Amino acid sequence: MTEIYDFDKSAWDIKGSIAPIQPTTYSDGRLVPQVRVIDPGLGDRKDECFMYMFLLGVVEDSDPLGPPIGRAFGSLPLGVGRSTAKPEELLKEATELDIVVRRTAGLNEKLVFYNNTPLTLLTPWRKVLTTGSVFNANQVCNAVNLIPLDTPQRFRVVYMSITRLSDNGYYTVPRRMLEFRSVNAVAFNLLVTLRIDKAIGPGKIIDNAEQLPEATFMVHIGNFRRKKSEVYSADYCKMKIEKMGLVFALGGIGGTSLHIRSTGKMSKTLHAQLGFKKTLCYPLMDINEDLNRLLWRSRCKIVRIQAVLQPSVPQEFRIYDDVIINDDQGLFKVL
């Protein structure tokens, strides 16, 4: 039995939206580089210099003899760094990077990035830029099938997204608890509805916001579980959720991310499941990569958040991450 509880819009009305990156071009048709700064926090961190950087650009042929042929639109997550430089200065250096892209494969298709340009202002992000990085291709590219293997490719930076980490404490991504299941427990999930306004160019505005498309995604927060072999009622779980005082915001971690902060009282069991942290971050890059790619340059706004209370999936139910399932004859074996 599923129970749904609606949060009041005051829980996200301050920082529940992200402005779009409106594409503008030079006279020759090239995109003008732009930077977008997002601050999903409450501003109670003493040091305001920590930020997460995310690059967007074009994967194109690296041919010095002719005009480059664009193959796909891609992204490069650089991670967290500490810098006092202006966003425009960071963008300028990023556009001058010589980033090589190579398509390869492991468990799934991958894209390899490495930079050949010396770093100055971007030194705090040298771990990704100088030692190279490998990403799941579908997470960082909108059309990896169009990237050739017989022609050298480069990643030309066009846009930069900076997320200021202004919240006091740590941004915890509780990965280990996301698949945790328990007998007689109630799973606490969130269903988030976004209204999306794709960046269609300057001066082009849809007058009626209701005409804009909406999309949903779901995240798992934790489980409410009693010590005895009894199950909490939905009304009791709703009361515990209300006491948590959850505040929501949208950030740019990995593209678009949902940030949650508990400003009230949290149950001891749930607090332990979340690593005793009250500031959480859920990147859509991990949750829903297709939706994340759609939101790379778009304006998006939270229009609804609902707490979804469901019975925890029984432990005897197996999670199948592989399309090959073992059979009794042993013809296929999942290693």
Curated annotation (Swiss-Prot):
Known role: The M protein has a crucial role in virus assembly and interacts with the RNP complex as well as with the viral membrane. Associates with phosphatidylserine (PS) and phosphatidylinositol 4,5-bisphosphate (PIP2) at the plasma membrane. Interaction with PIP2 triggers matrix protein lattice polymerization. Matrix proteins induce host membrane deformation and curvature necessary for virion assembly/budding.
GO terms for biological process, alphabetical: virion assembly
Upper lineage: Viruses, Riboviria, Orthornavirae, Negarnaviricota, Haploviricotina
Main location: virion
Family the entry assigns: Belongs to the morbillivirus/respirovirus/rubulavirus M protein family.
Coiled-coil regions listed in the entry: none
Record's protein name: Matrix protein
Localization, UniProt: Virion; Host cell membrane
Pfam families reported for this sequence: Matrix_Paramyxo_C, Matrix_Paramyxo_N
Gene Ontology MF terms: lipid binding; structural constituent of virion
